Every structure is written in structure tokens, then in C-alpha cells.
Amino acid sequence: MQYLNIKEDCNAMAFCAKMRSFKKTEVKQVVPEPGVEVTFYLLDREPLRLGSGEYTAEELCIRAAQECSISPLCHNLFALYDESTKLWYAPNRIITVDDKTSLRLHYRMRFYFTNWHGTNDNEQSVWRHSPKKQKNGYEKKRVPEATPLLDASSLEYLFAQGQYDLIKCLAPIRDPKTEQDGHDIENECLGMAVLAISHYAMMKKMQLPELPKDISYKRYIPETLNKSIRQRNLLTRMRINNVFKDFLKEFNNKTICDSSVHDLKVKYLATLETSTLTKHYGAEIFETSMLLISSENELSRCHSNDSGNVLYEVMVTGNLGIQWRQKPNVVPVEKEKNKLKRKKLEYNKHKKDDERNKLREEWNNFSYFPEITHIVIKESVVSINKQDNKNMELKLSSREEALSFVSLVDGYFRLTADAHHYLCTDVAPPLIVHNIQNGCHGPICTEYAINKLRQEGSEEGMYVLRWSCTDFDNILMTVTCFEKSEVLGGQKQFKNFQIEVQKGRYSLHGSMDHFPSLRDLMNHLKKQILRTDNISFVLKRCCQPKPREISNLLVATKKAQEWQPVYSMSQLSFDRILKKDIIQGEHLGRGTRTHIYSGTLLDYKDEEGIAEEKKIKVILKVLDPSHRDISLAFFEAASMMRQVSHKHIVYLYGVCVRDVENIMVEEFVEGGPLDLFMHRKSDALTTPWKFKVAKQLASALSYLEDKDLVHGNVCTKNLLLAREGIDSDIGPFIKLSDPGIPVSVLTRQECIERIPWIAPECVEDSKNLSVAADKWSFGTTLWEICYNGEIPLKDKTLIEKERFYESRCRPVTPSCKELADLMTRCMNYDPNQRPFFRAIMRDINKLEEQNPDIVSEKQPTTEVDPTHFEKRFLKRIRDLGEGHFGKVELCRYDPEGDNTGEQVAVKSLKPESGGNHIADLKKEIEILRNLYHENIVKYKGICMEDGGNGIKLIMEFLPSGSLKEYLPKNKNKINLKQQLKYAIQICKGMDYLGSRQYVHRDLAARNVLVESEHQVKIGDFGLTKAIETDKEYYTVKDDRDSPVFWYAPECLIQCKFYIASDVWSFGVTLHELLTYCDSDFSPMALFLKMIGPTHGQMTVTRLVKTLKEGKRLPCPPNCPDEVYQLMRKCWEFQPSNRTTFQNLIEGFEALLK
């Protein structure tokens, strides 16, 4: 922008030299008064003066923002700056004010994005994300409807700050290359004065160029230029002044008439950015004598200087991120005549120097902010870690400068990548920490809050907490609720409630109740019924911030949009490998529904017309042909692996379909599974070694989280060791293998087997798989790493594992408190409360600095036993049943004492029962604790009493009772189809029991319990016995209370019980089921009609005789003949001739088709 052509006696080069020297020296400071004051660039604002006490820098920034009417949305662009030390204060910096304190700080916009105004057509525009634009991505054209980066107050403040910087020579005026270039820079500065004065005149409604004498252009140009002009002769000064006035008038006539005050502010600030006046405006440049750029375990000491001289520069900008270069030499500018002479004499030398310096002036990109995972500060050394495991390490002049540098990068990260995360605990903003702990968002707008509720299901009572966009003292709670209308029925609405924050106390607007924390307030509100207008509701689930969530808190720059490509999982994507190109090797083991083989992949390369066969060692994961029904899920896992590329994730070559086999072909990793290695080398493992493994795994999972991909099967046996690293400084190198069969297709039993690696929510619903599940698995895997690959809960049965989750237990954590806390946070039963993987990586690095001893940790000998019930917490409700020797009660197990505990069925012996009965109950307990099937009643635990002499059996309570009670009451809504479904479920439970070599001996409708209208479970295992492995039957030593009318002939005659004997009993139970347990058609009533009146042992004798004669229970009313024929197959006299439970299942399923 060249407005004037002033050459006469204008020593432009002197001015430029002064500008450079001025920037190197301290800005002339006014000695601050005692105390602390925060000054503003707005002339009508008095400094903020602080009384005695402690303040955080963030707290002072909020107070300053309120003074200057800066909105909460723009507040995070500002920070506190100390001109005397040239350092910025991190948000968590504690400022102590006492009698001896004397400090002046400047409230400044620190975080700057060039072309935020969009007037530079050569550069991409910058704006805030808005709900309208979030689906469209980044567009090259300007988007007028997008949300501007700055509000009016922020723009006004930035304009005042820009003027201050130019006048005080704080703006980075570019270095001139020639004498003429120096004149051009002077002209640009004078042009800025034209804009500033025009703005002032328009604000004051003055006419240009008639201005008061005290309004001189000298007040609006750099002080060094003003000083330079004053040293020039009078004629030159007058000429400058006259030409300036003429131009001001011309500018007013041609430009001002079409401009507003806003336009002039934008024009002024946009000109400050231009390369004709400044260089790197809005950037911060840090000088260092040590700069290391390295990849993981491969150090590249590319930049270091033992002498301590400053050689390198690191620049941080909002638009381009972190860049570095070797500091270029300052080339003095010579006058044109001298330069021409020197060019002739030393042309070649200059040419080489210029080329070398040009290379030095070019900046090298290191990282844009979303790529950064965490930052570590050690004294004055800063280590920046990227997602691709590259690292930048630089040494700054002091720890204070290191904190200033890190707080800059951290702030830009929140503006461009994740508004609710911090990269380094040393600079963590207290408000961000508070928000994370309370599940509260920053000042997102209402549209984003409602969008979030809709995305998460919009259930009634679901809510979002967010700070107000306009008021620093208010938090808004946006809630999903339903308005009840007689005409429209339930109509979904979103209501906002205001939470007031005053002096650290929180209260709902309109309420007199105040609470010391937001968490306390929300816990209180969740217990209340909230009302507004004609709507009432109860708060349920809080929708917490998620990693990398798009909102109006984030700034959309071209770099941020380009950083992460969008992956679509809507279509399967992987490389197809021909079966002729793989050679199968030895069998290595089994996975879940898969077989693992070593193998060779033949890769054909055609180089320069010569075909070359390359053999690659691979692993072949073959889906069992009997499970071809889950081929699609198998391919989905392969597709997920093909979409990722990370050094700590196993590489998938592709998929091969070979006849009926589906095969995943993946990278062979030499060291094999980590758990086996840790078992073998447990004595050689060190704390640093374990931390490296944990960090590498967290890095891989953070990468997946950024892409919103879920692994679903994280554990040490799925971590493969590419390098042992025990005897070297480089350390281990691990790779995360593929997840195998997705959790979504696992049976419930397979899910239970994966406890405690599988997340609790996935056990309840295997399709409820999210990134949060990997965080739980990481916590368990961290436990394994700590304890050298030991298996948690390895001695627990399936039923005990299930109870472990039902009781919300976790494995016993290590003695290191911080490590235990990290595991606990990962293994939170609320998926929304688990930390982001970026936060996990940050915390692991912080923890590693403390160097805790996790080598000597031995596996805990005592784990929490969720199957142990304390007698004092069992509250009796009522009796459920009673026999000769025992009884069953309904109790509530209520350790919290608030009547919210679960209801359980408690089986115990009567006081008069003898020792044999106690032994029988203990056998029943031992059987139940080893059984796990969806159609067998769940064992929950035991309760010891009388010093261990007494025992109670705790089982799940099924309120609908047994089939004998349920069927007569619900006869109208249970048809034949449902009866057959019940029959199939009973057969499945009995088939499972037989597969474990148990005979039930008491199968009857009274012992089949109803969980729901669609599911039944087999119960009462009091007579159940185990068959010895070398026999096919169990011999009863006594026959007390034997259910003779359900017994097979061999049981009545020889007291021998086979699995086939249970098949006979099932036939009788099926008869009960089909007669709806009508007492007139009960087995006892029907058999007594056949054998006549009798009692005692004669009943058994006559019953046996009747059965030998071939008489059986008649066909139930309305029972199809096909069903009765299946029933009759259960009643073959010889056990070996009877049908099996598996055949019965197939028969019933065929009838249902």
C-alpha cells in the first residue's frame, strides 16, 4: 500500500535499523505501582487493580473480558502478557498479591488467525463452525452465513491492540531488502496513520481533513519513524505534512464515504497482516539452541549447538501450526551505489550466500495442532508428541518461557481440534479441568446442544450442560422433555434451565438452594421432579463432551479441515488375495471361532520387465467353516483393519476366500503375544519398559479414537511384540493385532468369558460397542502389563464373572495411587465418564516422570469377591417357598441402606436340618457356581453365618414364579407357539447341564422359573448330582422326597439316574406345559387314575407295573399329534432308546417353521 512518495532527506534505512534495534530492546516501561494491575488497550478502560490474595491467570482474564465486554466465546483468544519479561502467563499460573508485589500485565489477544476477516482473496477464510456448515466441510469460497470468528467487542479490542503494537514497534515490521524497500515500508506506516485517523474522525463524527491541531499523524505511526522524521529538515517535514493532508482528503472523498467504522477497523487490521508491511503477524517465534526432531526410538539430532548460541527458530501460528528453521543471518542493507560495486567484485560469493540464506529463511512444517497427542515439560525442555509418534524437543531459556510456549500450543489445540482437552497438565486451564470433571461443555450455542441431544437418542431427561455464550456467571442446562397434549400426545421439546454461579456456589435459577460444586447441584437435581410450564420430568443422563467434537467453539481453518480425511464404514474395503498366492503353514492355535496358521504370501514384482517372486511371512486367520454365517462380521473386522495405518497396529495385507474358508492375511510379528513373553521374562522387565508398552498401546488406540473406529478386543494376548527391547535403550516395540470376530456377534456366554476385558455395557448388549469400550479394555490391559501378563479373575467361573460386573467391581489395583487412579478412570462403569485416549497418553507420560515402582508388584492374592453377601445387608421381604428341610425367601440385598439394592432369592436350611442336609446344600452351591446358561437360574453367591457353620444360597429372583404358578394365570396370552418356545429353552438348558455331566433329577414345571413372557429358566438344583466320568449314571443312596411321578422306570427300580432319565422327566414337564399346569391334568392325578388309590411304597410298585405295561400320560387337550409323538419319544422304557435333548430341540424348531 503506497500512499506517499517521500524520498527527500528521508533516511528510511535509518528508520528500519532503529525498528530492528527497538524490537530487540525493552519497550520503554512505566514503573508499575505496588500491587498488580491488568492494563487494557481501550483508552476508556481503567486498569484492573487487584487486592491481596491469590488469583489464577484464567480468573483475571475472565474479569478482564467482563470489563471489556468480551464474550465467553471469544474469551479463549486472550491471555495475559508481561512486557517486561516478554512472557505470556499460562491459564493456571498462580499470581500472589501481597505488600511486596509490583506487577503490570497486559490483557491481549494472543491466539490469532490470519484472514479471519476474509478480505484476502489469496488466502482461505477462517470462521467458527456453525450448525449449518458442519456437514458441508470446508469450502474454497467465502461463506457469508458462517459464524464470524470475532464479536464486535473483540474486534474493537483487537483494533486498539493493533494500533498499540504498531506505534510501540511491537508489530513485526518486515526487514527491507533495499533502500527503496525501506521507503516503501515508511509509506505503508504513513498509510496506516491515514486509516487510524479516518477511523477516529468517523467515531468522533469529525469532518476530514479539518482536524484539531492536536490530532497529528505522528501519533499513529511507529515511534521510531516519528523520531526519524523529527530529525529531518524543516522543509521535508512540512512537505510530508502537506502531502499527508492532501492524501487524507483524497482518501476521505473516495473511500470513507462508502465505508463504516467496522470496515475501517477491518481494513487497518487486514493491512497489518500484509507482507508489504509486516512478516509473521500474529505469530510467535521462539529461539532455541537445541532442537531435536525424532521418530519413535530413532533419534535424529538434526539441530543442536553445544556452544549455546541461538541457531534455530520455532514459529507457532493459528493457520499453519508449528514450524521451524535454522535462524537466517541478518544481511545488512546497503545503499544502491555501494551495492552495485560490491556485486561486481563479489558476485559469486554473494550468490552462494544468498542461496544459503534463502534456504534458511524457508520454514519446515512439523505439526498442525490436531496431530499433537500430548506435551511434556521437563524444566525448560519441551517435548511435543504427534499422532504418528514423531517428536519435537526444544530447549528454551527458562521454565517460564517453556510454560509460555506450551500454553500457546495448548490454546491453539483447543481452538482447532478439541475444545475440551488440554495437552499438558502443567498448563491445564482450571475451567477446562472443571468442565471435564463435571461433564460440562464450553459456551456452545443452543443449536449444537440440541443437535447433540438428538444424536444421542433424545430420551426424556437427557441433558447437556454448557456455559453461557453471553454471561460468564451462568451455566445452561438444555434438557429433552415431552409436553403432554391431549391432541398431539407426547411432543418432544428442548428446554433451557439457568444455573447461576456466584462466589463458587451453584444454584438453579429461582431456587434458594446453593451447592459448593456443580456435581453436588446435579446430584441434588437428579433426585427431584423438575417442572416448567406444563412439563415435568426427571433428569437422567448427562451428554458429556466427546473427543474432537465439532461446535462453534472450534475455528475452521483450511489446515484443520485437511488434516483428517473422512473414512466411511458403509462399504467393505480390503484387498483381495488369490488363493494361489498363499501357502498355509503350521497350525499355531485357535481364536474365537477361528484357526491361526503361519503362512507365506507370494508377492510378484515386475521391475524393469523382470518378474520377481517375493515371499512374505504372514499370519493366516481362518474363519471356522462352521461359522460361515458370521462371514460378513469377519469381513467388517478386516475392512476396519484395512482402513488404518499406524506403526503400532498390525498391517493387514488383505482377505482370501479359499473354497468355503475366509482368511485374513496379516503381518507376521516375530515376538508373538505379549502376555506369553511377559510370563517368560517377568524377572527382566523394568518400569520404563512397561511404560513404553503402555504408551505405544495408548498411541494406537488414540489414533483409532480420532477416526471414530473401535477395536473391541484389546488385551495383552492381542498385543504382538515386534522387538523385545529389554537389553537396549531403544525399548520394546508392540503392535495391536486385529480384533478377530466382532463383539456384536458373540454369544452372551462368549461375552462373559471376556470379563474383565470386555466393557460392562457390551455384556448387557453386545451391539452397544463404542470407543468407550476400548478405554475399559485398556484399563484391564494396563493391569495385565503391571502384573507381568497375569490373567485377572482367572479362577472365577462364568457366573462369578457375571456377578463381578453386576456388583460393579474392578480388579484390585496396584499400590501406586496415580496408576490405580488411571485404571479406575478407564474402568468406569459409566462409559461417558471414561477419559479420552489423548488424556490417557498425557497422564501416562506425567505418571512416568514420577517413576513409580511397578516391577515389584505381585498379583493381588485377595480380590474383591462379589459373590460374598453379608448377612447384615439381607433384608427379608417375604417367603417364596418351603420344603421339609429348607425354605426360600425373597430378600433385598441393600449394602447402601437406601432400599435401592437388588432383590434376590435366598435358600437356606431350617434350624432342625442335620449335617447331611448342609452338605447337600453345599453341593448344590458348588454345582450352581459352575453353571452358566441363559436358561438356567443364575447363581449370585453365598452368605456365611454362625462362624461359617451356616450357609445361605443366593440366587436371582424371578418375580413371575414357576411355570406351575404362571401358566394358569396367563393361559389366555400363551399359545402353542409360545409353549414350544418354552420347551426349546428348557431343552437347551438341560442339554447344557448334560454336557457338564450333571443330572437334574427334579425337572418339573414347579422347578422351571419364568423370567419374562419370552424366557424361562431351570431352577432348584437340590437333587442335582454329578455323574462320574467312568459311568453313565448316578446311583441314589436315599430317596427322600423323590418326585416319583416324574421319574423314569430305571430311577424307580434301580435308583440309577442317567441323562436320559432327565429326558423322561422333560416329557412329563412338557405334558404339564401343554395342559397349562391344570391340576385336573397333573401327572400325579392322571397316574393315580391309572393305578388306583394307593399310598407309600405300593405307589411306586404299581407305577412301575403300569409303565412296564406301556401305559403313558394321555395326549393333552388340543395338543397336535406331532408334538405328542415327540413327547412319547421321551418315554421309551429303555434309556438308550429315548430321544435326546438335541433331537428334541431340532424337532420343536422344525414345527415352529
Swiss-Prot record:
Residues 34-420 form the FERM domain. Its cofactor is Mg(2+). Its EC number is 2.7.10.2. The keyword Membrane applies. Ubiquitinated by RNF125; leading to its degradation by the proteasome. Autophosphorylated. Phosphorylated on tyrosine residues in response to interferon gamma signaling. Dephosphorylation of Tyr-1034 and Tyr-1034 by PTPN2 negatively regulates cytokine-mediated signaling. The modification Phosphotyrosine is found at residues 3, 1033-1034. Keywords: Acetylation, ATP-binding, Kinase, Magnesium, Membrane, Metal-binding, Nucleotide-binding, Phosphoprotein, Repeat, SH2 domain, Transferase, Tyrosine-protein kinase, Ubl conjugation. It catalyses: L-tyrosyl-[protein] + ATP = O-phospho-L-tyrosyl-[protein] + ADP + H(+). Disulfide bonds: none annotated. GO terms for molecular function: ATP binding; growth hormone receptor binding; metal ion binding; non-membrane spanning protein tyrosine kinase activity; protein tyrosine kinase activity. The modification Phosphoserine is found at residue 228. ATP binds at residues 880-888, 907. One of its GO terms (biological process) is cell surface receptor signaling pathway via JAK-STAT. Residues 439-542 form the SH2 domain. Mn(2+) was used in the in vitro kinase assay but Mg(2+) is likely to be the in vivo cofactor. Interacts with IL31RA. Interacts with IFNAR2. Interacts with IFNGR1. Interacts with JAKMIP1. Interacts with SHB. Interacts (via N-terminus) with IL2RB and IL10RA (via its cytoplasmic domain). Interacts with FER. Tyrosine kinase of the non-receptor type, involved in the IFN-alpha/beta/gamma signal pathway. Kinase partner for the interleukin (IL)-2 receptor as well as interleukin (IL)-10 receptor. Kinase partner for the type I interferon receptor IFNAR2. In response to interferon-binding to IFNAR1-IFNAR2 heterodimer, phosphorylates and activates its binding partner IFNAR2, creating docking sites for STAT proteins. Directly phosphorylates STAT proteins but also activates STAT signaling through the transactivation of other JAK kinases associated with signaling receptors. This is Tyrosine-protein kinase JAK1. It comes from Mus musculus. The gene is Jak1.
